[in-house]
Design a protein with these regions (language model features):
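Outer membrane beta-barrel transmembrane domains
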Residues: 109, 117-120, 210-213, 217-289
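Exposed, low-structure sequence patches enriched in small/polar residues
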Residues: 3-5, 82, 201
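Short, well-ordered, mixed-charge alpha-helical segments that flank or form enzyme active sites
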Residues: 156-162, 204-206
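Transmembrane beta-barrel outer-membrane domains
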Residues: 74-78, 124-130, 166-172, 188-190, ...
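Bacterial Sec-dependent N-terminal signal peptides
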Residues: 1-26
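Transmembrane beta-barrel domains of Gram-negative outer membranes and organellar outer membranes
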Residues: 22-156, 171-178, 184-186, 230-235, ...
Length: 289
C-alpha cells in the first residue's frame, strides 16, 4: 500500500475521532447547561442586576456615563466596564435610557464553578453583557405632594457566556414607579435633602420546563443629600422572586458624586446581602449636555 493511501486512511480516522470527541464535548456542555440555576445567586454580578433607584424627576439634559467596576466575594472576582446613555425626548417629561456592561476579567474558585455548574474558572477573552433599554415618564411633579416617575425596561439577550454562568442569554423586563420628595432645603437652594422610593415588577426567562419565567416584585428606599456641587445618595433595594432559588437579592448602595461645569465624577460602593453575594466598587465619569 502506497504512502498516499496510508495518509488518506489516517486522515479519515483522525477526522472521525475529532468529530466524535467534539460531539461528546457538546453533549457534556448541554448536560451542564440544563443544571444552570437562573437566579442572581448562581450567575455573575451583572446577569440579573437590581434596578437602580431613581430620584423621581425626569431630567432635561443628555447624559453619557462610563464606569469601571470591580465586584468580589470569596468565590468570584469580576472586573467590567459599564456604559449608560440618557436621552430626554420631551422636556422634563419623557426620556430614554440605554445601558450595557462589558466584562474584561473574572476568576472563580473551583467550589463556585461547581456550585454554578459553570464551564470554566476564568475568561479567555472579553464578554459582552446584556443591553437594557428603558423609558421614563414623569407622571406627577408636585412640590406639595410627590414626584412620581414610571419606568419600563427590557433586557435583551445579547449577554454572552451562558456556559460560564456569566449572562443568561434570555430576555427579561421590569417596570416600576419611583417616588421622590424634597423634605428640606435652604433658601438659596445650595443644600437639600430628598427622600425617594421604588416599587415594581421584575421578570426574566429561565431554562426550567415547568416555570419558563421567574417573577419578582422590586422595592427600594433611599435618601439623597446635596450641598452645592457635592451629593451623596444612599439606598436599600432588592427584589423577591417567586422560585426562592437564589432569586432574592438585596443591596445597600452609596454613591458620592461631584459636579463641575456639567462634568460629574462619582464613586459607588454596594454591599450585597442575602442572594447578592458581591461587594462592588466603581468609579465613573458622566458628561452632561
Amino acid at each position: 500500500m502506497s504512502y498516499k493511501y496510508i495518509l488518506l486512511i489516517a486522515g479519515l480516522l483522525l477526522s472521525g475521532f475529532t468529530r466524535t470527541y467534539a460531539a461528546v464535548g457538546d453533549e457534556d456542555w448541554r448536560e451542564r447547561a440544563t443544571h444552570l440555576i437562573y437566579s442572581p445567586r448562581y450567575f455573575g454580578p451583572n446577569a440579573l442586576p437590581i434596578p437602580t433607584l431613581h430620584s423621581a424627576s425626569v431630567s432635561n439634559r443628555w447624559e453619557v456615563e462610563f464606569r469601571g467596576e470591580y465586584h468580589h466575594y470569596t468565590g468570584d472576582k469580576t472586573k467590567n466596564w459599564y456604559g449608560r446613555l440618557y436621552i430626554p425626548l420631551v422636556n422634563n417629561r419623557v426620556a430614554v435610557e440605554v445601558t450595557c456592561t462589558y466584562e474584561t476579567e473574572y476568576t472563580l474558585t473551583p467550589e463556585t464553578r461547581d456550585e454554578r455548574f459553570a464551564a470554566g474558572l476564568k475568561n479567555f477573552d472579553q464578554i459582552l453583557g446584556d443591553v437594557t433599554i428603558g423609558t421614563h415618564y414623569q407622571i406627577l411633579r408636585s412640590e406639595k405632594w410627590l414626584d412620581i416617575v414610571g419606568r419600563m425596561y427590557i433586557r435583551t439577550a445579547t449577554g454572552q457566556r451562558l456556559a460560564e454562568a456569566r449572562f443568561t442569554d434570555a430576555a427579561g423586563y421590569w417596570f416600576d414607579l419611583t417616588f421622590g420628595k424634597t423634605i428640606a432645603k435652604n433658601k438659596s437652594g445650595t443644600a437639600s435633602l430628598r427622600l425617594h422610593g421604588m416599587a415594581g415588577f421584575y421578570c426574566w426567562m429561565t431554562n426550567s420546563m415547568v416555570h419558563r419565567q421567574d417573577d419578582a416584585y422590586t422595592y427600594g428606599i433611599g435618601v439623597t443629600g446635596k450641598y452645592r456641587n457635592l451629593s451623596i445618595q444612599t439606598d436599600y433595594a432588592g427584589y423577591t422572586g417567586y422560585e426562592n432559588n437564589g432569586d432574592r437579592p438585596r443591596v445597600l448602595r452609596t454613591n458620592l458624586s461631584y459636579e463641575l461645569k456639567k462634568n460629574i465624577l462619582s464613586f459607588k460602593y454596594s454591599h450585597g446581602m442575602r442572594d447578592n453575594l458581591y461587594d462592588s466598587y466603581s468609579l465613573g465619569y458622566i458628561r452632561c449636555f
